[in-house]
From Swiss-Prot:
Pathway: Purine metabolism; 7-cyano-7-deazaguanine biosynthesis. Catalyzes the ATP-dependent conversion of 7-carboxy-7-deazaguanine (CDG) to 7-cyano-7-deazaguanine (preQ(0)). Belongs to the QueC family. PANTHER family: 7-CYANO-7-DEAZAGUANINE SYNTHASE. One of its GO terms (molecular function) is ATP binding. It catalyses: 7-carboxy-7-deazaguanine + NH4(+) + ATP = 7-cyano-7-deazaguanine + ADP + phosphate + H2O + H(+). The keyword Zinc applies. CDD domains: QueC-like. It comes from Polaromonas sp. (strain JS666 / ATCC BAA-500). This is 7-cyano-7-deazaguanine synthase. It is an enzyme of class 6 (ligase). Keywords: ATP-binding, Ligase, Metal-binding, Nucleotide-binding, Queuosine biosynthesis, Zinc.
Amino acid sequence: MHTSALVLFSGGQDSTTCLAQALSKYERVETVAFDYGQRHKVELDARLNVLREIKSRFPHWAPKLGEDHLLDLAVLGQVSDTSLTRDVAFKMENSGLPNTFVPGRNLLFLTLAAALAYRRDLQVLVTGVCETDFSGYPDCRDDTIKAMQLALSLGMDKRFLIETPLMWIDKADTWRLAHALGGQALVDLIIEHTHTCYLGDRTHRQAWGYGCGACPACELRARGYERYAAALSKP
């Protein structure tokens, strides 16, 4: 039986929801983030605020929340010419993928997370990737995650489990899951303290949180919140 987990925690809506689920399931939960030269580096500050607020607002989770880790992955920005690591406009590429796709990002994240989990004796890796509401990123697909789980388990001779709580749900359902896990208190925390905007905008407050409201990440989060809120208003 698994008792511990390492959550890949960026400080966004999805990873915060995954962290809440891990805290509801496991006795010991640690977190890890990556500094890869992302334009929205403000998320690295936001995640610390989220961790602080979780400890404050959810005292039953606080004792389970262990060490937080930040890994330097600047080399990823050196090999990736994308709109997440360069000051260029968001657009679709000829490949059919948006230029927000950072090749190899989630593969590297999972590899480094597994190496850290190996050293920390953590049994489960938790990541917020999904196939339902995503931009076609191949490293978010269920087949990719299953292949990574097998490769990491074989390569480190340790049976890892990679959990993807959001794999088959959309953004509206992610809001619903957050409410189911932590009630309105968790929804409010996500609105006020998590960060999604690719441009790093923390000056514009929307109904769903802070962001420019126009980048792909903001649009996806906004649509999900609108559907979630609309369902709540129905008798």
